[in-house]
């Protein structure tokens, strides 16, 4: 028996629940809850090293699951891709059975969507001599951020990745991550905001105290947006050091869920 079955079947349900409204979602902090029970806080704050981001973190506070509510004007190419997205979340929501969210096919969410949505589960940050690694409970994937002084690969556009290519360095007490080479099939968020293969992303992490991590992001993609998209401040809270759950999207289970729940809810009936 696979231990992750219930978690994977939960994923589409979560998407439907998130489709209710942005306002409702915006008022419900994701931090500190799992399965309807509040998790214990990580403990009182103690002295910390601001250059050490290690720990298990979860999204906290009142913040939308995208860069900000003020998306920049799109280019004609960007607008066409946006109009073609059929989302199950927010003001443009359609029944999930009628949507085309790549996540509905178990495609990887990619970055930055994992930072917005995946971190409503948990994100662990691990540090070694030559890299910082983000490990996401949602999808159970890890993302290396190289800190050994290497440059971003010059052939990144020819070999795009779901998570892109990332390098990081410290600017005072701020950890700055620059990334390129993202697969353009991913969406930026649950609203269906698109990006092109030329998207560049900068993340700026700052550990305010032992228990609080802040993040701001800047997206630059002249093919899709008329100007850079700067996020509001995202806040994460330190969580107890507990085992990470396996939250996978399993195609075989997704297919069963679609036939039994999602398609009938959208008025699609498959004849036997």
PLM segments and residue spans:
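Bacterial N-terminal signal peptides
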Residues: 10-20
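Bacterial N-terminal signal peptides that target proteins for export
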Residues: 1-12
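PEST-like low-complexity, intrinsically disordered acidic/proline/serine-rich tracts
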Residues: 20-272
């Amino acid at each position: 028996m696979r231990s992750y079955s219930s978690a994977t079947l939960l994923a589409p349900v979560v998407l439907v629940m998130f489709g209710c409204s942005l306002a409702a979602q915006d008022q419900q902090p994701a931090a500190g809850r799992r399965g309807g029970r509040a998790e214990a806080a990580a403990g009182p704050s103690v002295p910390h090293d601001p250059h050490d981001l290690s720990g298990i973190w979860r999204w906290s506070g009142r913040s939308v699951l995208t860069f900000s509510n003020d998306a920049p004007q799109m280019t004609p190419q960007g607008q066409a891709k946006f109009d073609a997205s059929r989302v199950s979340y927010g003001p443009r929501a359609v029944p999930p059975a009628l949507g085309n969210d790549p996540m509905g096919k178990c495609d990887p969410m990619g970055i930055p969507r994992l930072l917005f949505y995946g971190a409503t589960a948990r994100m662990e940050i691990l540090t070694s001599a030559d890299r910082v690694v983000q490990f996401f409970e949602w999808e159970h994937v890890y993302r290396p951020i190289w800190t050994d002084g290497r440059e971003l690969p010059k052939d990144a556009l020819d070999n795009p990745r779901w998570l892109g290519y990332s390098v990081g360095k410290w600017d005072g007490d701020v950890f700055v991550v620059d990334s390129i080479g993202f697969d353009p099939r991913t969406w930026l968020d649950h609203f269906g905001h698109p990006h092109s293969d030329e998207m560049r992303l900068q993340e700026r992490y700052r550990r305010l105290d032992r228990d609080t991590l802040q993040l701001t992001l800047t997206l630059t993609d002249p093919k899709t947006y008329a100007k850079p998209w700067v996020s509001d401040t995202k806040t994460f809270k330190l969580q107890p050091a507990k085992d990470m759950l396996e939250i996978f999207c399993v195609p075989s289970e997704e297919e069963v869920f679609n036939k039994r729940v999602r398609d009938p809810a959208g008025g699609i009936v498959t004849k036997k």
